[in-house]
């Protein structure tokens, strides 16, 4: 993909850049592979805000993506590369030899007309999905399962890739994009290659309205609030926060404090992220 940078014809256009979408080959999604997507605006089932700064945005349909890649031994031809508003990566429409169609995350280099396959006997080629036991060391992979048969949950964002570093017993050691080294069972599936749309990181929204189109609401600084609303609030003019370390809205330490608490899976992390 390419990035188009606008000329500064207005304040909103200054420093704005957009994708050229040159890799997109089909505009309308496959009707059988979409379903309605009801907006939650960051609310839970009680109607309370659990994720702040969410709401509004353009109406979307959810594209049903095949993260499991469990159709073994059946070749599929890439029919189209499509835009998906629900993720940063592009998606590829596959037409299997038996007539079924599925969406997958489009890896870098996958083109219309290419053939992909899943299963332990598939070739080591971009877009093919294999168990980690069948993938050579040093290979770049994405869409990695954490639990056998549950579907890929790791490394699905635009431009990301993990690397298979070692195999010990029943587990593979995979280096994540964050630098974390993690043990994953050898029977878990992964897809060969790097996720496409690598220039996504170079996109600059340019104006607040474009964030609103994406469903992102404004993020207000704590120092701009009243003292009843935030520990940093209050004071005359631009007052210092009045505490040694910054705090969250709920009075907990912010910045540099680890929030991960999942002791069941800590033993699978060989090295923490950088």
Curated annotation (Swiss-Prot):
Keyword rRNA-binding: yes
Gene: rplB
GO biological process, one term: cytoplasmic translation
PANTHER family (UniProt xref): LARGE RIBOSOMAL SUBUNIT PROTEIN UL2M, RIBOSOMAL PROTEIN L2
Biased composition (Basic and acidic residues): 227-239
Keyword line: Ribonucleoprotein, Ribosomal protein, RNA-binding, rRNA-binding
Gene Ontology cellular component terms for the protein in this record: large ribosomal subunit
Family: Belongs to the universal ribosomal protein uL2 family.
Species of provenance: Chloroflexus aurantiacus (strain ATCC 29366 / DSM 635 / J-10-fl)
Ranges of compositional bias, category Basic residues: 249-262
Subunit structure: Part of the 50S ribosomal subunit. Forms a bridge to the 30S subunit in the 70S ribosome.
Annotated segments matching region Disordered: 220-265
Protein name: Large ribosomal subunit protein uL2
Physiological role: One of the primary rRNA binding proteins. Required for association of the 30S and 50S subunits to form the 70S ribosome, for tRNA binding and peptide bond formation. It has been suggested to have peptidyltransferase activity; this is somewhat controversial. Makes several contacts with the 16S rRNA in the 70S ribosome.
Pfam families referenced in this protein's UniProt entry, alphabetically: Ribosomal_L2, Ribosomal_L2_C
GO MF term list: RNA binding; rRNA binding; structural constituent of ribosome; transferase activity
